[in-house]
Each structure stands twice: as C-alpha cells, then as structure tokens.
C-alpha cells in the first residue's frame, strides 16, 4: 500500500527506491549470517534441535547466544541473563538501528513463514465535537477577588441560586475522518487549531472537564468496549519526567510497566508453529522477542539517537541534564515501547535538527509500513523531505478539518479553490499558511476574480465536495465490521504486566530516587542527630529532678518536643511527594500501573529511614535526659515514636496527594500540625479543652502518641514515689494533672491507635492518587486560539533607537567540565571537553545561523559567549569590537533568548515586556516612547491580541509553547540590544509563526545589529534568510564557518568539492543535505574528517584573518563603558521590582487567598479552644494555657508563613537568575521588592488574626496591650516569612530549603521558653535562648499582657511577680523584645538579599 507515501519498504528486497545516507549500512547488519565452518553449523543445528524438544513454556524463556570473542554458543535463560550474557546480547542487537527496516523485515518474515498475522487498527471519528468552559476577560484572571467570587459562585450554582458565568469555548467542531493502518498521517495546523485535543480524543486521554460528543471507534468498537490507553499511545508535547532518573532508567521503567515486545500468546503460538514446521529462527531475532525491557529499551534509544546520553540524568531548570531536544525525544521513547498499535504523537520533534527529525520519522514510518501500525504525528515545521515520508495529511484550522486524505491530492484540492504553492515553497509551510487570514492572499491564483478571505469553515465545506472528501464520507457510511478485527488488536486488560511486576518496577524506581536524593536523607539524619544532642544537653538529667509536678511537666515537655522533632522530620516528605505527582498522574492516566503499586513503595521504602531516625533520637536522648532506666521502657519509647513517625509521614503524604500544590499543602500541613498540637493534651489539658472541641482530642494522633509516651515514663519505678500532701505516686499525679489516663493499658491503646492511623492515612493517600486528577491545565494551548489576528506591522520602528553597532570575535574557545562519574572508569582525562578550539566572529548587519546535530554544542557555545555559564572551565579569547569582553558591560548591550522560556507566571505579556523595557532601556527613553516600542514589538511577533493574557507556568497554565517562545524573543527585542543571541527561536513554532519570528529577526539585523541564532529545522525560506553559517559537529568542533551565498551556493560549492560527499538533489533543502552529508555516520563511511578539511581550507585562513582584523580596535574607537552598572538607578530598580511583585501577588490566590483563609480558620480555632482564658488570672495553669496559645500561634502561623512563601520564592528565583544575567537590576532591589510586597499582606493577616483572637480569648481591652499584641504578631509573622525566603536563597532547591527550615523551626521551638523556661535551661545553652526569635516573641507577648498585672494567684503570688521570677520577663524592659523582633525581621530580609547576591545555584 503506497498511496503517495514516498518510498515503500518491502521485506523481500529491503528498500525499493532511493536511500538516505544515514541508513546505508545494511551490508554490515548484525543480522547477516557469516559463513562459519561446517562444524560450527552442525553444533548450532544440534543445539537448536535440543531447544525445540523443550516444552513451549520453557522454549519461550530459552535461547542461544554467541559469546565473544570466539562466538561460543551458550544456552541462556532470557529472564535471568548473567552480566556477560547481557553485554553480549546488547552488542549483538545494538546495530539494529543501522538497518531498522532490515530488522523489522526479518521479524515480519518470521511471522509470515508460519502464517501469523499482526493485528492492525483502523480509527474512525464521526461528528466529533470538543467543548470546554472557561471564564473570559478579566474574570479569567486568577486574582484574589476572582478566587473568592468563584467559590461563592460555585456554591450558588450547586444550590441553583445563581447561573453559571463560564462561557463555552468550541475546540473541535463536527470533525470526521479515518486513520488507517500501514499509513503515516501528518497532522498540520496552527497553534490553537485543536490538534492536541483531536489527538487526545482519539487516544482516549481527554480530561473529564472537557465535553466530548460524537463517535470514535477502533476497528468498529466504541471506546467503552476496550481500554484505549492500552490499545493506543498518546505522546504529549509536554515533557514530564523524573529529573533524578537517567534517560535509560526512564525508558526502561516505561518498558517494564507497559510490557514490551509482542503479546505473550502470540509468542507462544509462534514457537508452537515453528516447532511443528521445523523452522530454525534467526538467533538475534529469537533473543530480541523473548527478552524483556533491557534490549527493547536499548533498541529504542538507538533509533532515537538517545544512546549517547542514555546514562545522563534528565534534569530540570535548576539541575543540568539532557538538552531540550533530547528531552523531547525521551518523551517519545517512553511511549514507543508501548505494545499499543496506534500512535498519536503531539509535536514530538520540537527542538531537533532536520536530519535527526528525518531519521526518527523514517524509523517510525518503517515500523508503520512493515508491521501495520496506525500513526498520526503532529509537526510544526516539517522539512520537505520529512513531509514526503507521510502518506496522509490532516489539516486543522479553527477546530475544523479542512483536509483529510492522501498527500498526493492535497495541492490539487487547494488549487481547486484558488490557491497554489510557489515553486520554492515547502508544501507543509504552504499548508500551514494558506488558512491564515494574514498569509492567504499571497497564494491566490484566480486572477480573474477578486480575492476575498476564505475562512476555515468555507474550506472545510469545499473539501466535502472534493473527490477525496466524498470518498471519506462514503467510506464512513459503511461501518467497519467488528468481525474483521484481529483478536489481539484491542486491549481489554488495564495493565501490561502482572501486579507483581508493576509493584517491583515501582519499588526499583523508588529505590533509585531515594539514592539520587540520598543527600537529602543524610542531611535529615545529621540534622536530627544535632537536634538530639541539643535536646539531651538542654534537658540533661543532672538538671532534671523528680520531686514535683512542675518537674514532671518539664519531663513531659521533653517528650512533647521529641514528638514534634519526629513529626517535623517527616515534613520534607510532603515536598518530595508533590514534586513527583505530575509524572505519576501522567503515567496513571496512561495505565502504566495502578495507584497502589506507586503508593505502597513510597510508604514501605521510607520505613527503614523512619526506623533509623527514631533509633538515633531515642538512643541519644533517652538515658542522657534521664527517662526511666528500665530497658523495656527504652524500647517501648522507641516503638511509640517509630509508629508515630510512620503515622505523621502518612499524614504528610496524604496532604500532598489531596492538595497537589506546594503552597496549599504547606498551609494544610500547618493546620494539621496546629490542631494536633492543641489537642494533644500538653498545651491544653483534657479538662481545659472546651466540650465543643473534645472530639479533636480523641482523633488527634499526637494525643495518643503523647499519652503513650507519658504512661510509659510516669508509671515507671522512677516516679513511683509520693510527695508531701499527696498519697498517690508522683507519676500518677503528673499524668492526672494533664488529663492523661494513668493506666498501663493506655500504652498499647495508643500504639494500636497510631498503627490504625498509619494504615488509614496511607489508604487515604492511595485513594487520593486513585480518584484525584492533576492540577495541570492540559488544554491551555487549545483554549487560546490566536492564529487569526489581523494585520501586523511589517517593520520595527521602535527598534530604530540609538545604539552602537558591535562585533564579537572568539578564538580558540575551549569549554570543559569535570568528568561525569559514569565516564570516569572509561576515561583517562579528569575533564570532559565539550568545545574544542572554536574560533569565529559575528558582525553587525550579518545574520548568522549556528547549526549542528543535537549534541554538537550549539547552546554551550552561546552560553559561553553570552557569559551564562555558571560552572565548568572556559579558555580562549573573546573580544567586543576589538576590546576584551567584560561581562558587566557586555550584559548591558546584549540580549539572550534562552531555549527554556522562563518568565514570571503571574504577569501578563504586556507587563512582562514593560518590565524588561523599563529596566533595560536607557533613562533618557520616556514612558511614551517605551510604550510605543513595546506595542510595535508585540505587533511584530503577533502577540498584541494576547497582550493581557497571563504568562502562566510551562505545561501547567497560561500561554502555549509557541506563544511563550515569542514572548521570550519580545522580552529581548524591547531592550534594544546591539548583540542578540537566540537559542532555537523557532522551536515549538509552526511554519507560519517561525516565518513571522524570522522576519522580525531579519528586520532587527537590517538595523545594523549583530544577531546569532541556533536553529534546528529551517525551511528553505528560513535557512536562506541567513547571511552566514557557523556549522558544528558532535564533539564541539566547527566544520564550516562562512557565507551561505545566493540559494546557499557558497555552502553547496564548499561541501560538494570534498571527495566522497554526494551532490545535492534539485529542490532539496540545503540545511538538511548539509547535516546529512556531515553526520558522524557519513564521516565514518567516507573517512573524511570535516574538521580537518575546514582547518586546512582557504576559508579557515580567511576567517582567521578576519578574526585578527576585528580583534584590533579602530583608532577612533573606545572600550565599551557606562557611567553606571545598570541602565536604571537604584530607586527605579526598586520601584520596577515592587511593581511586578505587586501584580504577581495579587494574581496568586493559591498563596494569598489560601493564607487568609488559613488565618481565619486558625483564629477561630484558637478563639474557640482558648475561649475566655485571658480573663482567668487566679491560677498559674490558666497563665500557662494563655502562654500556650501564644506559643502555638508563633509556631503554627509562623511556620505556615515561612513554608508557604518558599515555593513562591523558588519559582521566581529561576526567573531572577535569567533577569540578573541580563543585568536588569542588582539583587538588592529584587530582594527589597520581594520583601516589601509581603508587608501589607502580613499587616492585613495580623489585623484579621488579632481582632478575632484578642476578643475571643478575652485579653484585657487596653489600647496599649492591644497595640503590643498586634506589634509582636506582625513582626513575628514578618521574620518567619523572611526566614523562609532566606532559606530558599541559601539552598539549591525547594526541597532542601524545607529540610533546612524545619531544623531551625524545631530549635526555636525548643528554646522558646515554653517547653523549658529560661531559668531551667542549662547555663551552656542560654546563649541560644537569647538569639532565638520565638523566645523574644513570647517574652513580648507575655510581658505586654501579664507583666504589669497586679492580680494574685490562689497561693497569694502576684501575676507580675510570677512572670518576672519564673520566666525572667520584666515589663519595664518591654522595649527590648520589641527592638529584637524588629531586628530579626530586618536581619532575615538582609540575609535573603545577600544570599541572592552571593549564590547562584543554577548549573549551566
């Protein structure tokens, strides 16, 4: 079946026509049988005969393998290969990618010989409609006001009081078509046309929030008759992977979960028939079919060119890993191992060079044609040679199918309605642009009639009358007979392998992740050890006595603190769990595994860590503090704390899975800690808890834990003595004073309750994973259709601002990094060199393309030249117009569009550009001119209609990939730089958007600027818009640096003159040809070292002379200098940063709105639990309870503020690194803006909390006392918030900041003066009391409320005297704690700014 698909693969004679250079190694196929001796053949025949006598079950697990070096045949169990056997097998099969078609043909022939047919799938969709509901306009902004309005509106809708204000958005409108097996289908359409929604609908992966109508069938079966996620594979355009795993581990995990190779029943049938017909299979094919994940994984990695980075971690924005193009291929590889027969692939090749793109698509095409797969691939800029690989074309525009049929007829159809593709125009580019309102007119050929815009609806209607459309409609009328469907085509089981194998795969992965995060766990253990040492020296037995109930309270305080330490130690589990959830939800929805196989390892494998941490704590503290010396009670305390640790870890995992957001999770986690603490029986005794809160006491895990620990300690022999005035043992008195149960059975009741919580919370964690969905907005790119946006300006008037044209030269540039651990055993050098003696020059008015295959070092070179590298070793000379480059001044005159589009998520496009222009344009540019520049740049990159759209987070919300890319370019263009580096500016854009961007870049160059672009898949038009080419090969070496010439004539002449290089075909894309003929495989085949050829050429000598000339400054020139380090003065920087932070905070309800909601809940909780306790001044217990409310407030409200701000600062810090590298501002204004914006929100939080709590607790209504209460609360919340910021600034990532912060929370808790007063703290630790901010807060709050009270307790002691004698608080010195808490807030804010200035944790 050809149907216009270009070449056709036949299994009898290999490829029938033509041949691309990359796949010309068929003669050396690893599957060709060598002419061995007769003796060896006889031996092999005998071994095969022995294998055939085995039962079929055993035969499926046994194969023959030739071991190097002498080819010794060995009978192996494919399920349990030894290390040398695995190595030999991988070497034998490693060459399959060199002749992928040959390998597939051999496999197909093996099936054909015994009459086994492979299953195929025909997908039909009829009258398919997809709709979504969304708020539009300003109501769609996630502001605090809108958030609360949405909540009330949702309640109103549920009660049928109000009507819905969401508007329906049509994504796909009444589309129909057929996708057939053995056919490669290309899906084209501009962003926002509905491509992603169509692919997800066909794959059965659309979210439930989207309304779908119409019919989709596979082989005549509707989707409720089988499992579409197992029968098909959807490859997302969003790259979601575990950053800590390597490429090989990621693909291998997918293979283990989905079941690789071919269905087990088919393999058994194949072996049975071969045995009956006495057929001896090819040994490598036999091994490949029987092997599990390892061989298939390596095969896929080889095909996709990922074998070179197979053992490199994936990485993320903060951790260096694989490149963007490699990450995109990894997303494809993860799904290619699926046994599904239908593939729906969404923009899978963004960021890849045209040669690599061609190779990958061709490999997929070979698989589809030979094995009968069904495939739709959405591509943005397919090169002509890649376009020719497809058999069928689907074109979407405005949610309508305007063409669905053979590639051969698509141009005929558009000619029939008056549009013709120009001769040197890529057909795919033409098809992308012909439906566009802006570009359609240039293709109009009906000169006898006046042109008018023909809409997508009109084109779709015309297609129905075209003969292809009529044929599709006719075929749809006849249903596909279900009886024709192969029994194995559609999967009816949810999962690919047994539950045992899925559980084992998740266990193996969890162990790997724990190893990669081992530093975190080691740091936790070290921190716990330090805290244990601190605790045992604070509560040292020499200072601990057993002669009063008050002393018993100190012992109980040590137990309570130990519980909190163990509890807080599990807090980091929340952040780790949330970080993994996006990948989990993706894999769960694709039926990689059931949720319980994921949740069980994450619980069970953390248990040994809890066990060891508890041992450390109990072993260090138990005897030194002086708990009961009975060894049995020692182990009982260990058991109680261990079970409590498991329960609280389960609680934090449950919160993570329930909220799925770090900010909301930290708030909810703080609420749970607060409720557990207040109802534990320590802060408030059981008798003091109000009757309406007693239920909280009975369900609190901390109550059972503390009751268990207290019973274990105070019923011991050490406390079995009486004191004067009492007949009961002291231990029972201590227990009864706090309302605990003084019976020994309560130890086991408590342990049993905690075990119940362990099970319950982990079950709830699993239930959340089963039923809840990811918070990612999957369809954000479809809901913002933006491709019909009227006319835009043709030039950049605003870019014609005064600037100094600058050239940049670089000579003998070397860049190396420390040798990765994985390569140290194989390498003799201590460093890995990524750039090798690179030399060149970029000049004003010259547009240079920086090209090369993936891994050539293009981005690395740009990073080095732009000064963006933060690690590694750089050698060589870089000059700017003849003067040595100085990064401080260079950053002022250069712009760098990074490959990763990093922007603040909560500002609009216009605001992002305003911020960049405000800080980077000179001070003499007034606001009107600045606004004009911004608007013209937005018009230029066609973002003007979206100027009020929020940027959002990549893959989560806001702008689509291509809109984000255009914003990245616009942010740099508004800065009016002299030198611009653009790293893959057209990746992720469709052909039309790429052309728009290149026109903008060309206009920029024509103003006399120096512009360098890395580019991967340029069309002929785009490639020939460049003036010069800087071509690199893998390994970081240049192979051509020079002009392109008219129609690339200079480039073609240079390479065609090299012996062994094939001539370019007529009409072939020069960029694709150039990459093909210089590929590593061609270098190996022809024996040509293109680097040496270049360095021996006249062109190289000419370039060296040019570098020498440009490296010498002109006599009239001067070195680049500016009167100030930054474009704008310090005050303007502060105002700009504060302006952006104000917008970001107002539109961040998950932080601000949740914070206020939490504040109100906590205030009501405290007020109702401590109701009226401030008025009770007749006994000391009431004072302790009032102080307990203050202590709990500081701990919970403060920790919540600190924990919730950390993910916000962490996200913005990534943006800060980019903006600081561009010298937009210094770190101090940024830090001031981040700090200052918090102050009004904290003030409002303080007022809300203070008004509610002060009145409900019943403190004395005095103006001074109320002021001091608000004063200390405000600065306490402030220093906690700023401490959270500081912790992020001092640590490399959010998870580590959480661990570090938790250590200080617990230290502050210990030395706050509540668990153990100052007068009882050992002398050697009192210094820490004086530097503990919480101690000063409690000092201020207690002193201001009770330090001047003259009322007397029952025993006759004045309240003010007790406060002075017991706590050491002096009312006349109230100004001291006031000054100290203010100083702590200022100190932490200052250290936050200092950390931003001194540390850069971004590894590049």
Swiss-Prot record:
Domain ABC transmembrane type-2: 501-714, 1132-1346
Sites where the protein binds ATP 1: 189-196
Subcellular location: Membrane
GO molecular function, one term: ABC-type transporter activity
Protein name: ABC transporter G family member 47
Residues where ATP 2 binds: 852-859
Family membership: Belongs to the ABC transporter superfamily. ABCG family. PDR (TC 3.A.1.205) subfamily.
Signal peptide: none
Source organism, top-level taxon: Eukaryota
GO cellular component, one term: membrane
Positions of the ABC transporter domain: 156-423, 808-1059
A Pfam entry, by short name: ABC_trans_N
Chain segments annotated as transmembrane: 519-539, 565-585, 607-627, 638-658, 663-683, 692-712, 751-771, 1152-1172, 1183-1199, 1239-1259, 1266-1286, 1298-1318, 1321-1341, 1373-1393
CDD domains, alphabetized: ABCG_PDR_domain1, ABCG_PDR_domain2
Membrane topology reported for the UniProt record: Multi-pass membrane protein
Purpose of the protein: May be a general defense protein.
Annotated keywords: ATP-binding, Membrane, Nucleotide-binding, Repeat, Transmembrane, Transmembrane helix, Transport
């Amino acid at each position: 079946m050809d149907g216009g698909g270009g070449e056709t693969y036949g299994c009898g004679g290999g490829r029938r026509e033509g041949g691309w250079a990359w796949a010309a190694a068929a003669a050396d196929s690893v599957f060709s049988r060598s002419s061995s001796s007769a003796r060896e053949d006889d031996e092999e025949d005998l071994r095969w005969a022995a294998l055939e006598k085995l039962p079929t079950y055993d035969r499926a697990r046994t194969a023959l393998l030739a071991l190097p070096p002498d080819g010794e045949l060995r009978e192996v169990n494919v399920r349990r290969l030894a290390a040398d056997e695995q190595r030999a097998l991988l070497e034998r099969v490693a060459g399959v990618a060199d002749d992928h078609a040959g390998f597939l043909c051999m496999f197909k022939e093996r099936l054909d010989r015994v009459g086994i047919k492979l299953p195929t799938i025909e997908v039909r969709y009829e009258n398919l409609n997809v709709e979504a509901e969304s708020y539009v306009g300003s109501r769609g902004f996630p502001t605090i006001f809108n958030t609360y309005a949405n909540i009330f509106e949702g309640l109103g809708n549920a009660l049928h009081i109000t009507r819905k204000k969401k508007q329906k958005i049509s994504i796909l409108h009444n589309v129909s078509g057929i996708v057939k097996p053995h056919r490669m289908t290309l899906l084209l359409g501009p962003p926002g046309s509905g491509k992603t929604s169509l692919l997800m609908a066909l794959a059965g992966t659309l979210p439930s929030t989207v309304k779908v109508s119409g019919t989709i069938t596979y082989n005549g079966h509707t989707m409720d008759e089988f499992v579409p996620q197992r029968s098909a594979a959807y490859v997302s355009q969003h790259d979601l992977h575990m950053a800590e795993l390597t490429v090989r581990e990621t693909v291998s995990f997918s293979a283990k979960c989905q079941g690789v190779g071919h269905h087990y029943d088919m393999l058994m049938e194949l072996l049975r028939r071969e045995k009956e017909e006495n057929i001896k299979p090819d040994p490598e094919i036999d091994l490949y079919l029987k092997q599990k994940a390892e061989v298939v994984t390596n095969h896929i990695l080889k095909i996709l060119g990922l074998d070179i980075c197979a053992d490199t971690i994936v990485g993320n924005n903060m951790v260096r890993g694989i490149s963007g193009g490699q990450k995109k291929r990894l997303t494809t590889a993860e799904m290619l191992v699926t046994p599904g027969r239908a593939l729906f692939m969404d923009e899978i090749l963004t960021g890849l060079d045209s040669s690599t793109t061609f190779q990958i698509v061709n490999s997929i095409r070979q698989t589809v044609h030979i094995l009968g797969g069904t495939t739709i691939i959405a591509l943005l800029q397919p090169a002509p040679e890649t376009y020719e690989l497809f058999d069928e074309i689907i074109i979407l525009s405005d949610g309508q199918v305007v063409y669905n049929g053979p590639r051969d007829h698509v141009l005929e159809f558009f000619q029939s309605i008056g549009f013709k593709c120009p001769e040197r125009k890529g057909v795919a580019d033409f098809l992308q642009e012909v439906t566009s309102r802006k570009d359609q007119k240039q293709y109009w050929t009906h000169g006898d009639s006046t042109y008018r815009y023909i809409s997508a609806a009109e084109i779709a209607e015309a297609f129905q009358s075209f003969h292809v459309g009529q044929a599709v409609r006719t075929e749809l009328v006849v249903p596909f007979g279900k009886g024709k469907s192969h029994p194995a085509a559609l999967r009816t089981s949810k999962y690919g392998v047994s539950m045992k194998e899925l559980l084992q795969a998740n266990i193996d992965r969890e162990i790997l992740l724990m190893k990669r995060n081992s530093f975190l766990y080691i740091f936790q253990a070290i921190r716990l050890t330090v805290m244990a040492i601190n605790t045992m020296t604070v509560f040292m037995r020499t200072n601990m006595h057993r002669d009063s109930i008050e002393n018993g309270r100190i012992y109980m305080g040590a137990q309570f603190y130990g519980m909190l330490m163990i509890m807080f130690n599990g807090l980091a589990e929340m952040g780790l769990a949330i970080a993994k959830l996006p990948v989990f939800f993706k894999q769960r929805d694709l039926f990689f595994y059931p949720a319980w196989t994921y949740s069980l390892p994450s619980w069970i494998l953390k248990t040994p860590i809890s066990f060891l941490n508890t041992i450390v704590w109990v072993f260090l503290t138990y005897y030194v503090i002086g708990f009961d010396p009975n060894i049995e009670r020692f182990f009982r305390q260990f058991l109680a704390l261990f079970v409590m640790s498991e329960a609280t870890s389960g609680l934090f995992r449950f919160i993570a899975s329930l909220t799925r957001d770090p900010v909301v999770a930290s708030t909810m986690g703080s609420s749970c800690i607060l409720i557990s603490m207040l109802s534990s029986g320590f802060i408030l005794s059981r008798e003091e808890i109000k009757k309406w809160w007693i239920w909280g006491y009975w369900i609190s895990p901390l109550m059972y834990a503390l009751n268990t620990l207290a019973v274990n300690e105070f019923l011991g022999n050490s406390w079995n003595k009486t004191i004067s005035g009492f007949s009961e043992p002291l231990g029972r008195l201590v227990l009864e004073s706090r309302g605990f149960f003084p019976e020994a059975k309560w130890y086991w009741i408590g342990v049993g309750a905690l075990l119940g919580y362990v099970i319950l919370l982990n079950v709830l964690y699993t239930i959340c994973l089963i039923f809840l969905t990811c918070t990612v907005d999957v369809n954000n790119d479809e809901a913002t259709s933006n491709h019909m946006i009227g006319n835009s300006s043709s030039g950049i008037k605003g870019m014609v601002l005064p600037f100094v044209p600058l050239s940049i030269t670089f000579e003998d540039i070397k860049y190396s990094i420390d040798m990765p651990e994985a390569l140290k055993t194989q390498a003799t050098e201590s460093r890995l060199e990524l750039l090798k003696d690179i030399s060149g020059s970029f000049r004003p008015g010259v547009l240079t393309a920086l090209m090369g295959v993936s891994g050539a070092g293009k981005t690395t070179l740009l990073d080095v030249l732009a000064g963006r590298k933060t690690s590694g070793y750089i050698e060589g000379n870089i000059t700017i117009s003849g003067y040595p480059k100085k990064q401080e001044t260079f950053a002022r005159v250069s712009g760098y569009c990074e490959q990763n589009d990093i922007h603040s998520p909560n500002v609009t496009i216009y605001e992002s550009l305003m911020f960049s222009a405000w800080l980077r344009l000179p001070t003499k540019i007034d606001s009107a001119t600045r606004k004009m520049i911004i608007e013209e740049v937005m018009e230029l990159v066609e973002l003007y209609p979206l100027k009020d759209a929020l940027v959002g987070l990549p893959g989560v919300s806001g702008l689509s990939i291509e809109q984000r890319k255009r914003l990245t370019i616009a942010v740099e263009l508004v800065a009016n730089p002299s030198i611009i580096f653009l790293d893959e500016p057209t990746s992720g854009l469709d052909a039309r958007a790429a052309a728009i961007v290149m026109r903008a870049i060309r206009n920029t160059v024509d103003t006399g600027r120096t512009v360098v672009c890395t580019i991967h898949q340029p069309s002929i038009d785009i490639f020939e818009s460049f003036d010069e080419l800087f071509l690199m090969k893998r390994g970081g070496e240049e192979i051509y640096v020079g002009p392109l010439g008219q129609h690339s004539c200079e480039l073609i002449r240079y390479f065609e003159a090299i012996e062994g290089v094939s001539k370019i075909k007529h009409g072939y894309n020069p960029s694709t040809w150039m990459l093909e003929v210089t590929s590593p495989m061609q270098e190996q085949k022809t024996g040509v070292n293109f680097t040496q050829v270049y360095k021996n050429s006249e062109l190289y000598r000419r370039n060296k002379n040019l570098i020498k000339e440009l490296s010498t400054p002109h006599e009239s020139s001067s070195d680049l200098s500016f009167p100030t380090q930054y474009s704008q003065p310090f005050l303007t920087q502060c105002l700009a940063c504060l302006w952006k932070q104000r917008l970001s905070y107002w539109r961040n309800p998950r932080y601000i709105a949740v914070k206020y909601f939490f504040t109100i809940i906590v205030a009501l909780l405290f007020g109702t639990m401590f109701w009226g306790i401030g008025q009770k001044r007749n006994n000391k217990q009431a004072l302790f309870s009032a102080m307990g409310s203050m202590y709990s407030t500081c701990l919970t409200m403060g920790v919540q503020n600190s924990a919730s701000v950390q993910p916000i600062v962490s996200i913005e810090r990534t943006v800060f690194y980019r903006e600081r590298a561009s010298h937009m501002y210094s770190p101090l204004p940024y830090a001031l803006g981040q700090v200052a914006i918090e102050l009004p929100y904290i003030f409002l939080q303080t007022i809300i909390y203070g008004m509610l709590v002060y009145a409900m607790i019943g403190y004395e209504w005095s103006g001074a006392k109320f002021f001091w209460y608000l004063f200390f609360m405000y600065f306490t919340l402030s220093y906690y918030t700023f401490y959270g910021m500081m912790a992020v600034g001092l640590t490399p990532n959010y998870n580590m900041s959480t661990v570090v912060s938790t250590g200080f929370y617990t230290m502050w808790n210990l030395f706050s003066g509540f668990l153990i007063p100052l007068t009882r703290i050992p002398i050697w630790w009192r210094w820490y009391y004086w530097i503990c901010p919480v101690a000063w807060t409690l000092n201020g709050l207690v002193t201001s409320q009770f330090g001047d009270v003259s009322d007397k307790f029952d025993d006759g002691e004045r309240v003010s005297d007790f406060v002075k004698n017991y706590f050491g608080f002096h009312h006349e010195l109230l100004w001291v704690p006031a000054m100290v808490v203010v100083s702590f807030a200022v100190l932490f804010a200052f250290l936050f700014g200092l950390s931003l200035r001194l540390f850069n944790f971004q590894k590049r």
